[in-house]
Amino acid sequence: MNEKRLLFKDRHFTCSKIIGRRFACFAQRLSHRRKQSQCDLLNESTGQLPTTCSSAASNSINWNCRVKMTQQMQNLHLCQSKKHSAPSSPNAAKRLYRNLSEKLKGSHSSFDEAYFRTRTDRLSLRKTSVNFQGNEAMFEAVEQQDMDAVQILLYQYTPEELDLNTPNSEGLTPLDIAIMTNNVPIARILLRTGARESPHFVSLESRAMHLNTLVQEAQERVSELSAQVENEGFTLDNTEKEKQLKAWEWRYRLYRRMKTGFEHARAPEMPTNVCLMVTSSTSLTVSFQEPLSVNAAVVTRYKVEWSMSEDFSPLAGEIIMDNLQTLRCTITGLTMGQQYFVQVSAYNMKGWGPAQTTTPACASPSNWKDYDDREPRHKGQSEVLEGLLQQVRALHQHYSCRESTKLQTTGRKQSVSRSLKHLFHSSNKFVKTLKRGLYIAVIFYYKDNILVTNEDQVPIVEIDDSHTSSITQDFLWFTKLSCMWEDIRWLRQSIPISSSSSTVLQTRQKMLAATAQLQNLLGTHNLGRVYYEPIKDRHGNILIVTIREVEMLYSFFNGKWMQISKLQSQRKSLSTPEEPTALDILLITIQDILSYHKRSHQRLFPGLYLGYLKLCSSVDQIKVLVTQKLPNILCHVKIRENNNISREEWEWIQKLSGSESMESVDHTSDCPMQLFFYELQMAVKALLQQINIPLHQARNFRLYTQEVLEMGHNVSFLLLLPASDDVCTAPGQNNPYTPHSGFLNLPLQMFELVHFCSYREKFISLYCRLSAVVELDSLNTQQSLREAISDSEVAAAKQRHQQVLDFIQQIDEVWREMRWIMDALQYARYKQPVSGLPITKLIDPSDEQSLKKINSTSSSHIDCLPSPPPSPEMHRRKTVSDSQPCSDEEACSEVFLPTNSDYDSSDALSPRDLDLVYLSSHDIAQQTLSGLSGSAPDVLQVHDVKTPLGPGQDPQGEGPNPDHSCAEFLHSLTLTGFTPKNHAKTVSGGRPPLGFLGKRKPGKHPHYGGFSRHHRWLRIHSETQSLSLSEGIYTQHLSQACGLAQEPKEAKRAGPALDDPRGLTLAHAASLPEERNSSLQDARPSVRRLYVEPYAAAVVAQDEKPWASLSPPSGGRITLPSPTGPDVSQEGPTASPMSEILSSML
């Protein structure tokens, strides 16, 4: 029994000991975790690493907080962290622990205050830590020559966060290390981001001394660690010292490499291509490029010096360029008319190199307005409009206060009746289907998404269901509202609603009501910009479209987002009308509408441009020829980067436009005007090529010499004007030439709106606000004057109407000052005397070959065939057809013309529009059916070119081949159809419609190529953006007056033709259906080529020498596209009997 008790006591004692030890271990772990949590809290509150925790914890935290480093630097830092974290003695450890405990336990409030800091303080501490880590990581990447790491750091952090220009403990910046190790790529990247050299290196001696010190200290440290490693043997501490030794050896080699790079480097050479430009009346601009040799050291600075003496003694000033993102320097604050000499020198770590003078060596700050002391056109107009707007608002407030008491009772009665009406007629919904009326459609888009209603429709509200056929003036007034969407409510309140108001005033009131309704439904004031023309259909619907690009896909209460393609496919599957509605046309052409909206917001890069002023008039409006790529500016080519024209250049233009001949003007290489002359000459040729006008037809063209158009945003224009009779093409007037595809005829008012919205934003915003308000006031005062009965009412109405007329007069005066296009138009149409600089003084019309070699940037399709006589077949088809396709600029919004019943005068085709009406590919194929047996495809593209030898040509000759230029000219020749009125039609765009329309089927209407009526509108629109060619032999006509039976003498007087007979080979397009393509190749392998044969009579005499154009000067850089010719095929022409010549009417 006693033994059992003793055994039980032993077991009990053993268990209690075990429990006690486990409890002690648990308490120890709990205490350790508590200390660790306290350290973490202190670390988060102070932004520092804990120093009282265990060595392993300290090392792990420190390891995780640092960026990944190389093995040598990691070991070096690991040893240093252990050295600092390990206590020197147990007493020291206790003392550190006691101090930390007192800090943690002493004051709860102070700890809470330190821990619960504001979010901004903690974020700033974290940012400081990130900056420190990023700076060390940047040094690490530069030392290791890791280009990818440098780019990643510069991408993730800003230069301020990386602290690039703060020297490290060795007194070096990342740029210093990159330069002295001759790491050119990294040095260039750092220089572009704003990196600088260390401020300690004030001279060559200081840099050399600093490098010697770094090398010496690293060598001493390596020697010391090497001795310690050799003496101690294999111990744990010795292993750590070996790691430190490797790190210091690597750093010693780095410093030695930096010192060697500094010793071998030399000062840089002179900068190259140093050009001096006159940029204003008080400034000059110097542009240059890097030296050809930097002598093993990257250039970090440039110095620009200027003086009024040629020997630069004394200097008038200098600029040190540290920012090397652009090698361009503008010298401001100069004296107008004073001659300045400028030179540029480069700097690297070995000092400044020799200076290079500019080309030209000197220049005088000036502007073209200094020639006749002219005031600038754009000066003070915005301030005048701001004052007028304040007066108009004050006048509105005055009259609204006077008339508010009179309208209270009537207002109550009207509001009650209106509320009862709206109780049964809900007007807060979007329109689902269009009935005959006037509507507003809103397009909000983000990338490929468009805002639709809950019924998957474009948001549309009705303006009026009984509108007149012509809404041109109402539409132009509505476009002005796009600059004042936020004032719609104020405008509605300022207009009294009366049933006896005029029709125009009621339409304006309904437009404001519909706009306010759209704003309430969409929950936003900004509805975007108005599309340049309303969309009409044959049902009497007119759709005004506004477009806005949103920044993100935010939610709408009455709408949702949908893919544009999905919306188009749904509408196509749900709606198959016999005649499309305006909504159908909107959805079909929505990509063109969005493209126009995007491009109308884009501006040209700063520079001097040459623009082409060409207008056409219809019944009630004038249209301007612009490009589809940039519809807010005229057709143009760039002359040079400098937008300023100096006084000397403008004086040269004025002298040349007078009686002075070209031979009397000095064009030596030393003349400053020689470069400007060459740039202007090449710009004229490129612009004529772009608008597809041969040189011999541009004999009467001239430059606008009244002023230089300063558009804004450092964009200036010189204008190229046609002959006075061809500036504005009147209805029914024959147009002798047709431009390439990609052009647009924009109404004059809409062109001015989009132009000023891009280049004079503040002015056009103020003008539209004032003009819209004053037009409404004019209608209101006229209505009040008609309704006035007593003498006092008549006198008050007359007084207010006269105030409005005064406002209108002042606004019109300001508008005329800014409206440059009307001044240019009036000048261009003035016949006696002939004004301007004739281009024949710049280029010779006989120099046709040089123009053909210029590659046009606007279009790759060349079509300079003049209009032939009308075809009887076409005339017959014209008489039986009830409608015709519209022009390509109208096809994106109005797909077909209205009938006589609802025909609008604004829809009348201008002569330019008539030029663009063309026959479809089916009509061309029907005309060539007899010659080609129906095998001609719908679309052909040029693939290979072969120029057969003409009579008298030696195939073994080694001289220059004159056929090559003709091959380039005929490479992109397009065949177009012609209307009975002797006009051509060019296509715009290059989207083939074959895959979209499917296969053709025989139908009832042969004029529309077998399509049913509900497909006709779709085919017409699609064909305006496709090419049509047929196979056969074509004859190029010589001029607009040439016929097929013209005599050689008449042809010689009419204009030049091609020099020699040439042939052009055309292959089938890849877009043909496979079955048709294969059948053509198998059945008729010989009918695959198109030959162009000119007239036999030579027009230009062979003894005439072409006018030798000047070669580009040295140092001048002309920004023109390089000519690219087509690939010439070596295959000879086929031997098929195709001697008959088809007329170019095909």
From Swiss-Prot:
Function of the protein: May play a role in neuronal function.
SMART domains: ANK (SM00248), FN3 (SM00060)
Bias (Polar residues) ranges: 1131-1146
Gene3D superfamilies: Ankyrin repeat-containing domain (1.25.40.20), Immunoglobulins (2.60.40.10)
One matching Pfam family: fn3
Alphabetic keyword roster: ANK repeat, Repeat
One cellular-component annotation, GO: spindle
Organism this protein belongs to: Homo sapiens
Disulfide partners: none
CDD domains, per the entry: FN3 (cd00063)
UniProt region (Disordered), positions on chain: 855-887, 945-964, 1106-1146
Protein name: Ankyrin repeat and fibronectin type-III domain-containing protein 1
GO process terms (BP): behavioral fear response; equilibrioception; establishment of mitotic spindle orientation; locomotor rhythm; regulation of establishment of bipolar cell polarity
Keyword Repeat assigned: yes
Residue ranges annotated for the Fibronectin type-III domain, each copy included: 270-366
Segments annotated as ANK repeats: 133-162, 170-199
